[in-house]
């Protein structure tokens, strides 16, 4: 379930910018699926077996627009109404607005909150993910979920070669995870995927904030889809 198309978080590495997704508008120009709550209710009303409903895989459910449109909240209300479970992935502490609904879903079925943590360094975070709350704010959101007995999972991704692939960064994030009592950590290796559309944007941001880094990527990985290293930098 993806309620929006496009994103305003501005993450420099975002795979969803890729041309393979055939987005016909600017990535920051958000397409809104305004009838999503109606379609969701129709589908859940007819479903004979309960299951987990997932959201956040392609577009964050807590974009800036959500503050006014409240599409995500309306869908959570429907999920809670029909007794279904929820798995929700976000980078935003706006999820705290809906903690009351998340608690009710957890009480009646199952609710798992997944949150992406990329870098322990707050200054670096504001470059890599400029228009969303920082890692420390996300850690605070995880702590709130812990206090409400809502299980959490962290996506430790992506690990960008030469940027956040340090032992210090990984230890910092793992300490956050341990302290917040997360139930699982997902990591897809030491690297990032780049393809047409997102590669060009990523390289432009490297030129802007990390002069010379693009050339280091080109020397190390060429045009490879997977840009990964086998070792962290100490």
Task: Label each region the model flagged.
Residues 45, 110-114, 138-148, 208-216:
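Short, composition-biased local secondary-structure segments
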Residues 232-234:
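Conserved small/polar residues in nucleotide/adenosyl-binding loops
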Residues 53-56, 119-122, 151-155, 217-222:
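A short alpha-helix capping/helix-coil boundary motif
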Residues 69-70, 103-115, 164-180, 206-209:
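Short, electropositive alpha-helical surface patch
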Residues 123-129, 158-165, 183-228:
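Flexible glycine/acidic-rich beta-alpha junction loops that bind and position SAM and/or redox cofactors
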Residues 132:
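Nucleotide-binding/hydrolysis machinery
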Residues 136-197:
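Conserved C-terminal portion of the radical SAM core fold
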Residues 1-114, 118-126, 135, 139:
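Conserved Radical SAM active-site core
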């Amino acid at each position: 379930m993806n309620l929006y198309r496009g994103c305003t978080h501005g993450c420099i590495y975002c795979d969803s910018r890729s041309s393979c997704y055939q987005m016909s508008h600017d990535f920051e120009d958000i397409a809104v699926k305004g009838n999503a709550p109606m379609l969701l209710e129709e589908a859940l009303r007819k479903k004979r077996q309960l299951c987990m409903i997932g959201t956040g895989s392609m577009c964050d459910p807590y974009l800036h627009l959500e503050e006014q449109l409240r599409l995500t909240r309306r869908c959570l209300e429907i999920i809670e109404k029909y007794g279904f479970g929820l798995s929700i992935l976000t980078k935003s502490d706006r999820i705290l607005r809906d903690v009351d609904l998340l608690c009710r879903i957890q009480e009646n079925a199952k609710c798992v909150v997944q949150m992406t943590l990329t870098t322990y360094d707050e200054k670096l975070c504001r470059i890599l993910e400029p228009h969303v709350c920082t890692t420390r704010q996300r850690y605070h959101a995880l702590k709130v979920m812990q206090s409400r007995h809502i299980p959490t999972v962290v996506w430790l991704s992506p690990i960008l070669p030469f940027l956040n692939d340090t032992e210090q960064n990984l230890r910092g994030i793992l300490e956050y995870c341990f302290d917040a009592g997360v139930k699982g950590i997902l990591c897809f290796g030491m690297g990032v995927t780049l393809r047409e559309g997102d590669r060009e944007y990523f390289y432009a941001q490297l030129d802007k904030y990390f002069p010379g880094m693009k050339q280091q990527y080109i020397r190390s990985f060429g045009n490879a889809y997977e840009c990964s290293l086998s070792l962290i930098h100490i």
